């Protein structure tokens, strides 16, 4: 108890400003977060395009009115429950836990012993004891390793989701969240913030009718990140909603905010074609036709005509570059607004570790691309969405051609269109393209394609006959290889490996 007349150290959440209150909506988005066109006409075109695309996170004043960003100690919040981040034995020593224990008193430690631990991603509840909060919800965030990024994302989502589920089950009115992903667990702050904000947003949309106040308690280090990303998921006006749309990440999760995990999403149907929304999309030609017929794609302009104008001297190189950049920005904007979870579920394109030079490794699994059964425009959008932030620095690509069939082979026209659309950084920063387990036919096709269609790629393509050859460029622990590729390589190349061993 505080001495009579003394000022309480605890903070009443009802007195804190909510996110919907005007604070200069544009402040957090100035500078780096905007598309800055040099000409006013170009800005108008992009604005008109943004106006025609709906954001997956619309302006909702009722939700914004529940959100509070608080720079301070979560242990001091006077609300129904606060969140404590700990380890699996609930004995972690970190600034958040230490403060909660200090203010709650020794009874909390005794109570935690009775819980017998908590697994990563789970949440358990105790009394608040000497805290102003009535309850403490304890959860365990994941340890982050780039190689197991998907697992870490799913675990962190589970932390937030399970905390919110407990709050719902106990009809809690207000909840104070700490930053669950501690520095000790090495989770990138910005990545973790995306998961936190979108999970809470989706929960409030779908199940948050009883929650009146939800506080994000942050430190000086985390506050700028939260202020930067909050407008993406909690826009405070229609204008901010439009401005934030192109800034959303590739993976915005499903309807609950959960990261899309391919192993859980892929389902084998007896007649997969029947699952398509459009029964006419049964050929590669019709898929490619969608790219040009879509209203969004039509803004792109005729690439061949642009080349012709350049050859005729009617369009300067600078003007052509600006036109290309505008076209790419439109595709990128569309990619960020589209639901691409069905393409992500194929796990045909994903990021893994780094090569021997420290460059990011992107993997393409040819066998996982059912060309005849998917919307190729969405496949193109997914490639742009995933690769856009990767290509800002040097990277390499590993393509597994292993056990692919005719139904997995991308049409040359589609590949050429992809090459023409992508930003210059895609081509400039690609240092190597490793073509693993090529066939004679694929080698010939690749030679023709890189010689006559995209000559700038020719010197970067390297045919890799076996995984041992690949491992001279990328260490085994730095690349996630599909099991069927490992099995195939072991079966087909075992005589080669045996001969190598015998020669040593």
Curated annotation (Swiss-Prot):
Residues of the CRAL-TRIO domain: 342-490
Region (Disordered): 20-46
CDD domains assigned: Macro_GDAP2-like, SEC14
Record domain Macro: where: 54-234
PROSITE patterns: MACRO
Compositionally biased region (Acidic residues): 27-45
Pfam families reported in the protein's UniProt record: CRAL_TRIO_2, Macro
Domain of life: Eukaryota
Cleaved signal peptide residues: none
Gene3D superfamilies per record: CRAL-TRIO lipid binding domain, Leucine Aminopeptidase, subunit E, domain 1
Family: Belongs to the GDAP2 family.
Name the record gives this protein: Ganglioside-induced differentiation-associated protein 2
Organism in which the protein naturally occurs: Danio rerio
